[in-house]
Every structure is written in C-alpha cells, then in structure tokens.
C-alpha cells in the first residue's frame, strides 16, 4: 500500500479527542472523506499531510512514518511527495502561472513534471504567461491543481476543492483530480462536505465529530 492511516486521533488543547477512520490506498486509488463542517475533516487532512502530529496512530506514506520526520526533513519530504490543493488557491498573484509552478519545483528541490505539459493536460496552457491575479476562479483552481501536481507527488490531498463551484464544474474538478492521480500513480484524498461529488469516488469514508 502506498498510503496507510491507522488508529489516528488528535486533540486540540481543552477539546475532546478526535478519532478518524482507518484506510489505505494504493497508487492511483482515491478516497472521499465526507463530513459536515466542524467534523474534523481539515484536521484529518492536516494529519495526513504531516502538518499536525497525531496524539495516537500513524500515517505511513510509501514506507515512511510521517511523525518520525521533523523540521527540515519533514518539510522537504512534504514538498517532494505530497501535493495539496487548498480550498482557496495558495498562489502568488504577481507571478505568472508558469512561474508559480517553477517556484514550487525550486522550493522542493525536485524536478517533477514539465509545467507546460501539465498545464496542457489541465487545459490552461494558454494562460502560462498570465499573472495569476488576472485569472478567473475556475482557472485559478486549475492552476492550484497544477501546482499540487508539478512535483509528481505520491499523495494528493484536496481540501474542499468544489465548495465554490456549480454542479458541472464540481464534477469536472473531481474527475480531473482522479485522472491526474491515476496518470502519475498517486494516492488521492478528497476532503469535502459536498454531497454532490459522492458518486464520483468509489471509496467514501464518513468523518464524524465525537
């Protein structure tokens, strides 16, 4: 298995402990983590990304236990092997689309996918030289996906990627994420409260607060 999440729990100071369902994924497989606002979905995603350390349990990505890594080693591992699609695109508005992707590769010290080839796959190669600040919401979302994929990660995490999209575009974004994950052999985890996309992913786990 490429990704394993086992017996994970986490507690914020003064709050009840949150427990999360176990699951595992091979390369090219996807899971939808579905839950209402406040259920702990984003906490679960942050644990899978190594942005939080679990109170109990562990996340193993390609044989590496994330909680065993710290500081620069963890940052470098995350940059090289985990791609994150945030709910609101984390892009530098003053840079061009291509420059945003090149910056992601530079910071991770990893030569991944060709930015132009990736933009072609996502249907926005014509925007490669455009400043990110001039893009539409849908275009910016695709660039955010491209940025998450540019280092050819082993794990793709998508946090509420369809929350601001209409039905048609929500479906397309999930299909796009699945297709790209399958193409590079990455595990895909989509965290959402959006019931509309439930039918797009075969493996669905409910995340419920205590």
Positions of PLM-derived features:
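Helix-to-loop junction immediately C-terminal to a conserved catalytic motif
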Residues: 49
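Conserved ABC transporter NBD signature motif
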Residues: 57-65
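ABC ATPase NBD coupling module
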Residues: 66-83
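Conserved ABC ATPase signature
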Residues: 131-135, 139-141
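Catalytic Walker B motif of ABC-type/P-loop ATPase nucleotide-binding domains
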Residues: 156-159
